[in-house]
């Protein structure tokens, strides 16, 4: 959520109401938590202590520098490591074959060098790799044979 302190308090009030009326807890997910200033982070503290919300914060920054100490001390940090290139390459191959959620209904001839390039340039980020694959396939017209040929030059531009 893109929030100021008033927005956060409103979400907390909704969580309190949900708990009192329905006995249901609320999960509060904040992406890019490092963008919250100290006041925005501090407003969460009493509600984490009371258990009003289950809090999940995501950040691409080092949480020990980007998140204030009181909030960090009430949190469990789960560092996520970059996905190895070999696993990204395997993911891209599955995306090319998957007819339901991937590009398996498209006729794609992907050079190994191009696929490996996309995996290497993703910096361990599966979302980046999949987005680059999609750009490569969708921005390349099919040849006369009806096949989309993705070579290294296409991959470098994706």
Question: Where in the sequence are the language-model features?
Answer:
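Short, ordered loop/turn segments at secondary-structure junctions
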Residues: 1, 33, 60-61, 83, ...
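Conserved catalytic/switch belt of AAA+ P-loop NTPases
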Residues: 16-17, 30, 34-73
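C-terminal helical "lid" of AAA+/P-loop NTPase domains
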Residues: 116-121, 127-142, 154-157
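Conserved AAA+ ATPase "sensor/coupling" helix adjacent to the nucleotide-binding pocket
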Residues: 12, 74, 87-105, 138
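Short glycine-rich substrate-engagement loop in P-loop NTPases that contacts/grips substrate
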Residues: 1-27, 38
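Conserved RecA-like P-loop NTPase ATPase core
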Residues: 8, 31, 44, 59, ...
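Short conserved motifs of the RecA-like P-loop NTPase core
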Residues: 25, 103-121, 150-155
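Conserved AAA+ ATPase "SRH/arginine-finger" region at the nucleotide-binding site
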Residues: 1-2, 76-89
